[in-house]
Amino acid sequence: MMAAGPRTSLLLAFALLCLPWTQVVGAFPAMSLSGLFANAVLRAQHLHQLAADTFKEFERTYIPGGQRYSIQNTQVAFCFSETIPAPTGKNEAQQKSDLELLRISLLLIQSWLGPLQFLSRVFTNSLVFGTSDRVYEKLKDLEEGILALMRELEDGTPRAGQILKQTYDKFDTNMRSDDALLKNYGLLSCFRKDLHKTETYLRVMKCRRFGEASCAF
């Protein structure tokens, strides 16, 4: 049987994951910086896993196996977020300050708010897209968490950061069109990549600040 201590911690973590940031801050006004980072990492992990599962299910359902590799090496799979100075892995992320990583994470998150707002209208079948109506809310929630961390690190006065002049296109609702399928496939691929970057940056910051044993990832 699981010990009472770890089980209680696990239940608390799950409960916090289900709460919006406004409720978390209200319920725990004295939440430590480590607590804010822990919650941000949990939320980013959850969104990244959801993005990965959605991409895999879309690929399995709509994209023939023989076409996947060739498509991933075309312009369809190009993510415009690659044009911003964002680290591509853990080692590069460690060269950036925490505030730089938070600002980049915020840019990545905000670039998806428009396209994902109506995601559930596109994927209405019985795939994993059944949870797509909550993706936008989860993404907004992570945005609030990142802003909360920036306020903590900037003494409550966050500076204006870089604004992306371009965001991703909306998902195409015409799922019977090959062009629409390719477009949506590319968007889901980029969403997965950008959420992986965001999760990596948050984990690097958390591990760098608090030196936990779980830093090996």
Swiss-Prot record:
Give all cystine bridges in this chain.
79-190, 207-215
Molecular function per GO: growth factor activity; growth hormone receptor binding; hormone activity; metal ion binding
Major subcellular location class:
secreted
> What GO biological process term is on the record, naming one?
response to nutrient levels
Annotated Zn(2+) binding lies at 46, 199
What UniProt keywords apply to this chain's record, in alphabetical order? Disulfide bond, Hormone, Metal-binding, Phosphoprotein, Secreted, Signal, Zinc
Q: Which Pfam families match?
A: Hormone_1
- What residues bear Phosphoserine in this entry? 132
**What CDD domains does the annotation carry?**
somatotropin_like
GO (cellular component) term, any one: extracellular space
Show the PROSITE patterns listed in the entry: SOMATOTROPIN_1, SOMATOTROPIN_2
Where would one find the signal peptide in this protein? 1-26
Q: Where in the cell is it found?
A: Secreted
The function of this protein is: Plays an important role in growth control. Its major role in stimulating body growth is to stimulate the liver and other tissues to secrete IGF1. It stimulates both the differentiation and proliferation of myoblasts. It also stimulates amino acid uptake and protein synthesis in muscle and other tissues.
Q: Give the family from UniProt.
A: Belongs to the somatotropin/prolactin family.
Identification of the protein by name: Somatotropin
What organism, scientifically named, is this protein from? Bos mutus grunniens (Wild yak)
Q: What is the lineage of its organism?
A: Eukaryota, Metazoa, Chordata, Craniata, Vertebrata
